[in-house]
Amino acid sequence: MTDRKEHKMKPGRRPTEGMTPSQERIMQVIRNAIDRDGLPPTVKEIAEALGMKTPSAHEQVQKLVKKGFIRRTPRKARSIEIVEQSPEEEPVEKKPDVARLVPVPIIGEVAAGIPILAVENHIGELLMDSRTARGPCFALKVKGDSMIDAEIFEGDYVVVRHQALAENGDIVVAILDGEATVKRLYISEETIELRPENRSYQPIVVPPGGDIRILGKVLAVRGHGAANNNE
């Protein structure tokens, strides 16, 4: 697991030094939204404002985080913050608290798209903060793009707490007719819906008595490349 660095401004560095033109435009959209609405934009709103695809906007936002221009709180809506740049300070190394890291097994793949056959196969592990990975947890690698508006992209890993029950609006991993999928859960008196976070996909409606089982609730999302693989 690589250490993360928080980059702060070096002496004489201009506010946009180190940004690409695309990243400068994204920063301007963020500033405008905060000035206008008092809230930062979502990645989807950034993409719409600049005529970009959501995955492309997400990639550039992540690069701005790595460069230290913004920070984000994982799995929190509208969590983008602009980092105030200090011209006196050098880059500061941030190391994880190793004592708090726990291994979470990666046991296979889950569909963010058409459900795929649920086959458990231990393919590696993620190191997670024990404050996040509470209880019996596992991870699955995401296939498909049905959850991109929730910032879950193909190749990412979802960290899931094993539980049979979940609340309306939770993002869950469900087994439907023997196949696994990650979707947002909505329950009514008549039906259960597994809703995608991508307008290109339709909700999966499960009638009363349908063959569905909640495998767990998604606690966190880790980008591809975060795993220690057995392969």
Swiss-Prot record:
Key word Kinase present: no
Keyword DNA-binding annotated: yes
Region ranges (Disordered): 1-24
Query: Whereabouts does the entry annotate DNA binding, in residue ranges?
Result: 43-62
Q: Where is the active site?
A: 146, 183
Gene3D superfamilies for this protein: Umud Fragment, subunit A, Winged helix-like DNA-binding domain superfamily/Winged helix DNA-binding domain
Q: Might you name a Gene Ontology BP term for this protein?
A: negative regulation of DNA-templated transcription
Which regions form coiled coils? none
Question: What's its EC?
Answer: 3.4.21.88
Catalytic activity reported: Hydrolysis of Ala-|-Gly bond in repressor LexA
The annotated site for Cleavage falls at 112-113
GO MF term list: sequence-specific DNA binding; serine-type endopeptidase activity
Write out the GO cellular component annotations: protein-DNA complex
Task: Alphabetically list the UniProt keywords.
Answer: Autocatalytic cleavage, DNA damage, DNA repair, DNA replication, DNA-binding, Hydrolase, Repressor, SOS response, Transcription, Transcription regulation
Query: Source organism's superkingdom?
Result: Bacteria
Q: How does it assemble?
A: Homodimer.
| Family named by the database record | Belongs to the peptidase S24 family.
Purpose: Represses a number of genes involved in the response to DNA damage (SOS response), including recA and lexA. In the presence of single-stranded DNA, RecA interacts with LexA causing an autocatalytic cleavage which disrupts the DNA-binding part of LexA, leading to derepression of the SOS regulon and eventually DNA repair.
PANTHER family xrefs: LEXA REPRESSOR, LEXA REPRESSOR-RELATED
Protein's name in the database? LexA repressor
Q: What is the species listed in this Swiss-Prot or TrEMBL entry?
A: Magnetococcus marinus (strain ATCC BAA-1437 / JCM 17883 / MC-1)
